[in-house]
């Protein structure tokens, strides 16, 4: 982990003093309630809801998310400051019913309460006092009925808000502009700031707000820690925050263990390791969350590009609706995946004795079946009797997923459940072929409209949660109790540094400097630079970064030329790259075996998508990963200090302080979680603050108060790193069969080749008269060697096309180890480029591993299978339902697989991916424990249709499975939606592109006279302006090859004197007639011996014969050509 930073360069020291939070009051008359509803977690009958903290919609522009909160005064003349950041969400509590619900289905609150009791989690217990009256916290002159009230609270003091220990001071109100509304905010200070005490009636408390926090925030934390006494957990978190008890064991007495743990042969160690891992997560996760964070650009709601073309509030709400639809696959994956982080159920220990897996013997497991089993406390006394659930015994196989399991995933919170249901409405159903189901209309008009429905009693069948559950029931995962070591799925924002091109971090030269003798002026041609250069070359050919063409091909000649130009650009870059590696003595054949795809998961809460669901998923993901990386550390400490019959709380009393102290150096920056430690100072001994004692009495004065920091060190998390090995190097026979490349030639080599998708795209352009499909036409050609020729077309051109496609496809099949069929020219170029590199590295036996992105695509479809579009209206019959939905459409989302994830990763995507954290020790006697976050696999057939086993490509099924060599990541780009695209600092002029194109032509054709091609390119780019080019113009355009200026000008003068049209085609035909084409002149060459220095002859006796191969003599002479001329 990095050393502590100085006070000048960390966000904590730069933050300003302020309160522990604010109460915001928004005028109902002008506040965009529908936009807030689309961002929030309202349900039918809600009294409080959560909304993301965003500048321009919930807080004012320029709001600082980092603050030094004044939270205590040990004496009247000294204040304590604590650096913290704000919580990601705000809580709307006053007049919350004015915000429309995001999901209109009734009965969610009662369902959540019943399910919470069924699973054994405690409900919220209100404080023995009434909620604060509006007059206690509303500023004078404001009508409480005309304003919406919400609380923005800091991370370090949210437990104080929950327990009613903050004080609102209305006299210190501030007027702020939130969007188009003139709003007011009132500061919240901790009651410890007032040494003389504050009457309880003046302390701000709202039972609905605290209940919402209990359900939407703290229950999820309790689930991640596998404790059921949520209220007690909040008390412990508050005590830890106030009294700085991070190194004291707290939650172990609250732990509960399933039967599989109690009955384990090594149950004592397993219970201790499980409890210790939870304690470490409780100690470190709050510290990481409350640390100061960078303010991302996506926090500025009023500048979201999403609203650029919106006119009026309806268009803005519709844009938000589409944006939410693009996030739906991430949320639905967490529900439909069997290995979702929401279903992580505990810690298990393998019974195997393999030494190589010692550090991986403890691992996180998941399974809904385990979550509803009975549990025992640390003293092995039963404490939860369990819940049978529907068919949980698995009489028909695994248990059935029920609505109660969905409520569990939503942390028994009606707010989160409503938001989950809203996202699930965008999902398409996948009907099982084994269980035929009635039509949606029949269900809505029949069973859903029955008074027997426990949720809506038949009054709102179209939007009832049971109806949504019925529509998607075949996609929910099975309920099992698994003890396997499988990946778990996490969701959140991607980091800014991802290496997801085909060869990942190959030759990035980071941490690979073995010696410090490298000259500073030596060029470092990295793999990243290679890809950038390739994109630049393609842009000169009129191909943008997404593979789109400026000029579409109009016939077979253009089609072939398009690919030949791309091939030439790729081959030129490959030669230059390989020469650079050889020149710098880089052992690329060894380095390619250890390259990885690298993805980063951002640990900044404010970088996460603006949605309370993603806040919940971020908290769960961080807590789970912290526990996972702590398991081998706890295991080793327990092995050195065995429990010997002690209960986990007893063992932790004697060992936790040492374990917690060492955890920071043992677990951070060891391969998965990166963080930095910052020292927070306040530059001045005093600061200007309001006189809070006077303000409490309604008088506003300022005073200069001496202050000091109550907490100096701050642990700031950065990223979680996930890797995927590119080149297969394992010995597992089953895996080897998935990666090994068959040596038999396939009959369908063309339709599986690199040109097939392009041949299909331009099928009507190439073959306007044929009625054959492109698939059949080219499959037929591979067998019968014949292609149709349109009437009036040149048979020679079509023969050249067929030979080009055939030859290129055969060559591709022989050398290809990247199992994709390119869909655009950028992917085609990168595939050719990387195949050439891998061939040079000798990697031709196995296919490489790929990461494919599943990118959401929203679409409007007929609403027949999406009853929620009807709202709360009644449905009398199936015919009435069909008529009502016949004219309506529903927004749904599907995912499309991308061949290469690198372009998506540049757009700052939201990602959902499965991760497995492996632990290992160093080499050469290094006994430190390192971790590696490896990309895993999704479990569950209902996650997405792209994850179902593909039957194979082509007309015949491919042998061998390809799923093991392809990993998938759900990715939603945010660039252009919530983050503005970067504009170029300087505009590129046309003349710059012309110059770059000419230099590229000359560089590629140094072996031949290139004046012919340069002139044709100039005529194509500049047209008639070529006639007036001066010598200075020609020298500028030719750049470092300006010596060709005279030849180019003479050729242009010849064209001008001929009077032909200034087009590339006319110029080419004219010059071919005059010169006979490029390189047509046949000059006589003589062989000239290359002189050798006298010193060399004297010292080595080396005599080199000159070559008669023209320019070949200028190339580097390799050893094989030098040895024959050696005379001793």
UniProtKB/Swiss-Prot annotation:
Localization terms from the record: Virion tegument; Host nucleus
Required for nuclear localization: annotated segments: 1104-1128
MF GO annotations: single-stranded DNA binding
Keywords: DNA replication, DNA-binding, Host nucleus, Virion, Virion tegument
GO CC terms of this entry: host cell nucleus; viral tegument
Gene3D superfamilies: Viral ssDNA binding protein, head domain
Keyword DNA-binding listed: yes
Pfam families for this protein: Viral_DNA_bp (PF00747)
Entry-linked InterPro entries: DBP_sf, Viral_ssDBP_head, Viral_ssDNA-bd
SUPFAM superfamilies assigned to the protein according to its UniProt record, in alphabetical order: Viral ssDNA binding protein (SSF118208)
Biological process terms in GO annotation: DNA replication
Functional description taken from the UniProt entry: Plays several crucial roles in viral infection. Participates in the opening of the viral DNA origin to initiate replication by interacting with the origin-binding protein. May disrupt loops, hairpins and other secondary structures present on ssDNA to reduce and eliminate pausing of viral DNA polymerase at specific sites during elongation. Promotes viral DNA recombination by performing strand-transfer, characterized by the ability to transfer a DNA strand from a linear duplex to a complementary single-stranded DNA circle. Can also catalyze the renaturation of complementary single strands.
Subunit structure: Homooligomers. Forms double-helical filaments necessary for the formation of replication compartments within the host nucleus. Interacts with the origin-binding protein. Interacts with the helicase primase complex; this interaction stimulates primer synthesis activity of the helicase-primase complex. Interacts with the DNA polymerase. Interacts with the alkaline exonuclease; this interaction increases its nuclease processivity.
Xref: HAMAP family: HSV_DNBI (MF_04007)
The family this protein is said to belong to: Belongs to the herpesviridae major DNA-binding protein family.
Protein's name in the database: Major DNA-binding protein
Organism: Epstein-Barr virus (strain AG876)
GN (gene name): DBP
């Amino acid at each position: 982990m990095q050393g502590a930073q100085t006070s000048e360069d960390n966000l904590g020291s730069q933050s300003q003093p302020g309160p522990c939070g604010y109460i915001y009051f928004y005028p109902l008359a002008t506040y965009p309630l529908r936009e807030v509803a689309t961002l929030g977690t309202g349900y039918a009958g809600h009294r409080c809801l959560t909304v993301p903290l965003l500048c321009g919609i919930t807080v004012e522009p320029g709001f600082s998310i980092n603050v030094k909160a004044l939270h205590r005064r040990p004496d009247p003349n000294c204040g304590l400051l604590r650096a913290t950041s704000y919580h990601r969400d705000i809580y709307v509590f006053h007049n919350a019913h004015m915000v429309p619900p995001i999901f209109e289905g009734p009965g969610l609150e009662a369902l959540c309460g019943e399910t919470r009791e069924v699973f054994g989690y405690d409900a919220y217990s209100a404080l023995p006092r009434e909620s604060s009256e509006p007059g206690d916290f509303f500023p004078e002159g404001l009508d409480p009925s005309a304003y919406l009230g919400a609380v923005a609270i800091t991370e370090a003091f949210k437990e104080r808000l929950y327990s009613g220990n903050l004080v609102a001071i209305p006299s210190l109100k501030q007027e702020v502009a939130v969007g188009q509304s003139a709003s007011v905010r009132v500061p919240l200070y901790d009651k410890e700031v007032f040494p003389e005490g504050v009457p309880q009636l003046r302390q701000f408390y709202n039972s609905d707000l605290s209940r919402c926090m209990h359900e939407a925030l703290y229950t999820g934390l309790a689930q991640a820690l596998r404790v059921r006494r949520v209220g007690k957990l909040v008390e412990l978190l508050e005590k830890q925050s106030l009294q700085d008890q991070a190194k004291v064991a707290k939650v172990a007495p609250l732990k509960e263990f399933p039967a599989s743990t109690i009955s384990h042969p090594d149950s004592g160690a397993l219970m201790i390791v499980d409890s210790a891992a939870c304690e470490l997560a409780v100690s470190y996760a709050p510290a990481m969350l409350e640390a100061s964070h960078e303010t991302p650009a996506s926090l500025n709601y009023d500048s979201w590009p999403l609203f650029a073309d919106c006119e009026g509030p309806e268009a803005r709400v519709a844009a938000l609706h589409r944006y939410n639809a693009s996030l739906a696959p991430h949320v639905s994956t967490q529900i439909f995946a069997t290995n979702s982080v929401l279903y992580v159920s505990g810690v298990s220990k393998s019974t195997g004795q393999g030494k190589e897996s010692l550090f991986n013997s403890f691992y996180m497991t998941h399974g809904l079946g385990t979550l509803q089993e009975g549990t025992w406390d640390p003293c092995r006394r039963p404490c939860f009797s369990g819940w049978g659930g529907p068919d949980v015994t698995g009489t028909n196989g695994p248990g059935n997923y029920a609505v109660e399991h969905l409520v569990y995933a939503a942390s028994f919170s009606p707010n989160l459940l409503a938001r989950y249901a809203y996202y699930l409405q965008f999902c398409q159903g996948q009907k099982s072929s084994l269980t035929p189901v009635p039509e949606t209309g029949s269900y809505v008009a029949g069973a859903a409209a029955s008074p027997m429905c426990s949720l809506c009693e038949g009054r709102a069948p179209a939007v009832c949660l049971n109806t949504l559950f019925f529509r998607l029931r075949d996609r929910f995962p099975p309920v099992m109790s698994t003890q396997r070591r499988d990946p778990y799925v996490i969701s959140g924002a991607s980091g800014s540094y991802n290496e997801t091109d085909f060869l990942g971090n190959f030759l990035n030269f980071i941490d690979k400097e073995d010696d410090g003798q490298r000259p500073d002026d030596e060029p470092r041609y990295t793999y990243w630079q290679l890809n950038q250069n390739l994109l630049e070359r393609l842009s000169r050919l009129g191909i943008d970064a997404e593979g789109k063409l400026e000029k579409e091909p109009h016939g077979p000649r253009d089609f072939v030329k398009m690919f030949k130009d791309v091939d030439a650009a790729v081959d030129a870059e490959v030669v230059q790259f390989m020469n650079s590696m050889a020149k710098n003595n880089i052992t690329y054949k060894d380095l390619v075996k250890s390259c990885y795809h690298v993805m980063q998961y951002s640990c900044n809460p404010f970088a996460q998508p603006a949605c309370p669901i993603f806040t919940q998923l971020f908290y769960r993901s961080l807590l789970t990963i912290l526990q996972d990386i702590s398991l081998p550390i706890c295991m080793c400490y327990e092995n050195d200090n065995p429990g010997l019959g002690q209960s986990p709380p007893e063992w932790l009393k004697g060992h936790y302080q040492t374990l917690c102290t060492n955890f920071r150096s043992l677990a951070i920056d060891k391969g998965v979680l990166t963080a930095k430690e910052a020292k927070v100072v306040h530059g001045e001994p005093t600061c200007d603050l309001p006189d809070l004692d006077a303000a409490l009495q309604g008088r506003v004065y300022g005073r200069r108060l001496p202050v000091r920091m109550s907490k100096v060190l701050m642990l700031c998390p950065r990223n979680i790193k996930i890797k995927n090995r590119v080149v297969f190097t394992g010995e597992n026979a089953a895996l080897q069969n998935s990666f090994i490349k068959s040596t038999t030639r396939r009959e369908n080599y063309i339709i599986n080749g690199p040109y097939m998708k392009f041949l299909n795209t331009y099928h009507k352009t190439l073959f306007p008269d044929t009625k054959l499909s492109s698939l059949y036409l080219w499959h037929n050609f591979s067998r019968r060697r014949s292609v149709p020729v349109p009437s009036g077309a040149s048979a020679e051109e079509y023969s050249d096309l067929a030979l080009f496609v055939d030859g290129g496809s055969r060559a591709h099949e022989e050398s290809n180890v990247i199992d994709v069929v390119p869909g655009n020219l950028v992917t085609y170029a990168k595939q050719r480029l990387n195949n050439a590199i891998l061939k040079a590295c000798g990697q031709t036996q196995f296919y490489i591993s790929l990461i494919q992105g599943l990118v959401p695509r929203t679409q409007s479809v007929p609403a027949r299978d999406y009853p929620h579009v009807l709202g709360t209206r009644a449905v009398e019959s199936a015919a009435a339902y069909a008529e009502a939905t016949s004219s309506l459409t529903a927004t749904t989302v599907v995912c499309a697989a991308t061949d290469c994830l690198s372009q998506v990763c540049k757009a700052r995507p939201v990602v959902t991916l499965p991760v497995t954290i492996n632990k290992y020790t160093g080499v050469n006697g290094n006994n430190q424990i390192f971790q590696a976050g490896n990309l895993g696999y999704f479990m569950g057939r209902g996650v997405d249709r792209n994850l179902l086993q593909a039957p194979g490509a082509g007309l015949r099924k491919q042998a061998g499975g390809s799923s093991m060599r392809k990993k998938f990541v759900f990715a939603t780009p945010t660039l252009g939606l919530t983050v503005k695209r970067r504009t170029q600092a300087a505009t590129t002029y046309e003349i710059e592109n012309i110059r770059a194109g000419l230099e590229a032509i000359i560089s590629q054709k140094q072996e031949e006279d290139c004046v012919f091609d340069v002139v044709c390119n100039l005529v194509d780019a500049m047209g008639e302006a070529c006639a007036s080019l001066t010598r200075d113009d020609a020298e500028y355009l030719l750049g470092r090859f300006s010596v060709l200026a005279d030849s180019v000008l003479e050729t242009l003068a010849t064209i001008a004197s001929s009077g032909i049209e200034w087009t590339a085609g006319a110029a080419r035909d004219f010059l071919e007639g005059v010169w006979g084409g490029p390189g047509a002149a046949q000059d006589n060459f003589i062989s000239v011996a290359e002189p050798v220095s006298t010193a060399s002859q004297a010292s080595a006796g080396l005599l080199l014969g000159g070559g008669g191969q023209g320019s070949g003599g200028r190339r580097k002479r390799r050893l094989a050509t030098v040895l024959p001329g050696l005379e001793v």
